[in-house]
A protein has these predicted regions:
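Active-site helical microenvironments for divalent-metal-assisted chemistry
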Residues: 3-4, 11-245
């Protein structure tokens, strides 16, 4: 079904590809025909967040690729929305979680600050974004702490984090782990160098994701954490194969 809100009724009630159009006055109180309940709202603020992320991350690409960085932000946002919207405790926070997921790297990887995010999207979004970063305590231009120190501090932080932060962070780590596994497997088959694109080698990456999977399994158990555990098991195998290559 195609829904067309805020448009006047027209004589043609069939969409471009032959699907029937459902007008707002024909949709029941549940917000959709035959669904299980009204979905959590996602307002124009989310669209503003997409535009802001696109602007701030313009010209950035995923490590070692020519894939626009916003692809990662969109993937993480989709995973976070699905997780939040199916969680009774987080459903009412779905929009804030979606916006925070879209902006989860904006403070760490662009010139934007937590104050900027709060001014545009509110304190709750800014709080989640700050909590998902491992470098928000650094001053502009200040050198980051060593990789292992940052990652251990982040793992310790997740052990105490709230569920909204865990939802966004888990979505981020799920997508990152998937991409690492896919690219590492392809590089292993092709005999190419993959791990050099990171600040830490395969063994350190395997340790980090093992620890993340352990924390998420305890703090946010469920299908999303289970998926991460499975992906991390494969990542660990690839790290071992790389070491013996």
């Amino acid at each position: 079904m195609i829904r067309c809100p805020d448009r006047p009724r027209m004589s043609a009630d069939v969409g471009r590809y032959g699907y029937p159009i459902v007008w707002p006055d024909e949709v029941g109180e549940t917000g959709a025909v035959g669904d299980l309940g009204k979905p959590p709202p996602v307002s124009r603020r989310f669209g503003d967040a997409v535009l802001f992320a696109r602007s701030m991350h313009a010209g950035q690409a995923r490590k070692g690729t020519q894939i626009p960085y916003i692809s990662h932000l969109l993937a993480v946002t989709a995973l976070a929305i699905e997780d939040a919207a199916t969680d009774d405790l987080l459903r009412d926070q779905t929009e804030a979680i979606a916006i925070a997921a879209m902006l989860h790297d904006v403070v760490e990887d662009t010139r934007a600050t937590v104050v900027d995010v709060a001014g545009r999207f509110g304190d709750e979004v800014a709080r989640i974004v700050a909590a998902c970063s491992d470098t928000t305590g650094s001053m502009p231009g200040e050198e980051k702490p060593p990789w292992s120190c940052r990652k251990q501090a982040y793992i310790d932080h997740l052990a105490e984090a709230d569920q909204a932060t865990l939802c966004v962070s888990l979505a981020d780590k799920r997508h990152n782990a998937r991409c690492i596994v896919e690219d590492a497997a392809a590089a292993l088959l092709a005999g190419g160098d993959f791990w050099s694109r990171f600040n830490a080698g395969p063994d350190q990456q395997a340790w980090y994701y093992d620890e993340l999977a352990r924390v998420f399994s305890v703090r946010r158990p469920g299908p999303a954490a289970d998926e991460l555990c499975g992906t991390v098991a494969r990542l660990r195998e690839l790290a071992t194969l790389t070491r013996h290559q």
